[in-house]
C-alpha cells in the first residue's frame, strides 16, 4: 500500500558536518562512496601528509591537557615523538626525517605560547541547528580574547585589526585566552606545504560554521577565525561580521539541501545505472589524491597517480 505524506510537513533536519558538505562540493561520486555506499569501497594506502598532520594535531591537543607545570617546549616535542603515526612514508629514513620536522614545527609553535593561557576548548565539538540543518564539528582550539578594537573609536597609535574585514597575518604565538575575555576565537591548525592567505580564512565555510556554533553554544560573540600554519609560523586571520557568517550559513544550507535530495534518491533504491546522474564525478587536480581513485575510471584517466608521500 502506498504511504501517503502530509503536505506542508517540515522536512527533517539534515545532519551534517562541514567535511561532509565540502566532500559533496568537491566530488559527488566521492561523497557517495564515502557516506552512502555500504560497504564502502576499499580506500587506497594512507597518506604521509595526513599522518604528519594527525601527529601534530594530537600532540598540540595533548600539550594543552598536560598539567600547567609540564607544558614545556620539550614536552610538546616528546608528544609528537611518542604519538608519531608511521604510515604513508617511502621508508623509515623518510619517516624519521618527517618526524624530526614535525617535532621542530611543534616546538617552535608552542615556544611562543603562554602555557597559562588556557583555551576554552581543545578538540571541542560544537553543534547548532537551523530550520534546514543540524551541523556539528570539532574545533582544534577555541580561545577567548578581549574584543578587537572598534576602528571607529579613538585608540592607541597602533590599533589592532578591525572587527570586520581583512585581518593581518601574525607570527605564531599571537595571543590566546585571558580571564577577562568576552569574545571567542576559532583556531584551526594547518600543516600543509602550501602557503595560505587571509582569503583562506575568510572563505572557509567550516571555520564560519564553527564560529556560529561556538557562539550559540557558549552564548558569547564569535566572529574571528584563524588558520595557524605551523610550517611557516604564520597566523592567517579573518574577523567575520554577522552578515558574512549568515552568508556562509546560507551557503551551507543550500549544499545540505542538495545532499539531502541525493541521499533520499540513493536510499530510495536509486538504480546503479543512474548513480552518475545523481552523483557525477567532478574531475580536477584533486583526483590524483582521491582515496577512491582506483574505483573511478574517469578520475584515473584524468589524473596522475600520487605516491603516498608526495604531499609532504
Feature locations, PLM:
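RecB-family 4Fe-4S metal-dependent nuclease core
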Residues: 1-312
Amino acid at each position: 500500500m502506498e504511504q501517503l505524506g502530509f503536505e506542508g510537513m517540515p522536512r527533517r533536519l539534515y545532519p551534517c558536518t562541514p567535511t561532509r558538505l565540502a566532500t559533496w562540493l568537491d566530488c559527488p561520486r566521492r561523497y557517495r562512496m564515502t557516506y552512502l555506499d555500504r560497504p564502502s569501497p576499499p580506500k587506497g594506502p594512507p597518506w604521509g601528509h595526513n599522518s604528519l598532520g594527525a601527529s601534530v594535531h594530537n600532540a598540540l591537543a595533548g600539550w594543552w591537557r598536560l598539567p600547567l607545570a609540564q607544558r614545556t617546549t620539550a614536552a610538546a616535542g616528546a608528544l609528537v615523538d611518542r604519538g608519531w603515526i608511521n604510515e604513508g612514508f617511502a621508508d623509515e629514513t623518510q619517516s624519521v626525517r618527517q618526524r624530526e620536522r614535525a617535532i621542530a614545527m611543534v616546538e617552535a609553535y608552542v615556544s611562543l605560547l603562554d602555557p597559562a593561557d588556557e583555551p576554552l576548548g581543545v578538540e571541542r565539538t560544537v553543534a547548532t541547528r537551523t530550520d534546514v540543518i543540524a551541523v556539528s564539528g570539532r574545533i582544534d582550539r577555541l580561545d577567548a580574547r578581549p574584543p578587537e578594537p572598534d576602528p571607529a573609536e579613538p585608540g592607541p597609535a597602533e590599533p589592532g585589526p578591525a572587527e570586520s574585514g581583512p585581518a593581518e597575518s601574525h607570527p605564531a604565538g599571537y595571543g590566546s585566552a585571558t580571564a577577562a575575555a568576552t569574545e571567542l576565537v576559532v583556531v584551526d591548525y594547518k600543516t600543509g606545504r602550501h602557503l595560505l592567505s587571509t582569503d583562506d580564512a575568510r572563505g572557509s565555510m567550516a571555520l564560519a560554521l564553527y564560529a556560529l556554533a561556538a557562539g550559540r553554544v557558549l552564548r558569547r560573540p564569535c566572529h574571528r577565525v584563524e588558520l595557524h600554519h605551523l610550517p611557516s609560523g604564520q597566523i592567517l586571520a579573518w574577523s567575520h561580521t554577522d552578515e558574512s557568517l549568515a552568508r556562509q550559513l546560507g551557503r551551507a544550507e543550500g549544499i545540505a539541501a542538495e545532499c539531502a535530495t541525493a541521499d533520499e534518491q540513493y536510499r530510495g533504491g536509486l538504480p546503479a545505472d543512474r548513480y552518475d546522474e545523481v552523483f557525477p564525478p567532478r574531475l580536477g587536480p584533486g583526483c590524483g589524491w582521491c582515496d577512491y581513485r582506483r574505483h573511478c575510471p574517469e578520475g584515473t584517466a584524468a589524473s596522475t597517480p600520487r605516491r603516498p608521500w608526495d604531499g609532504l
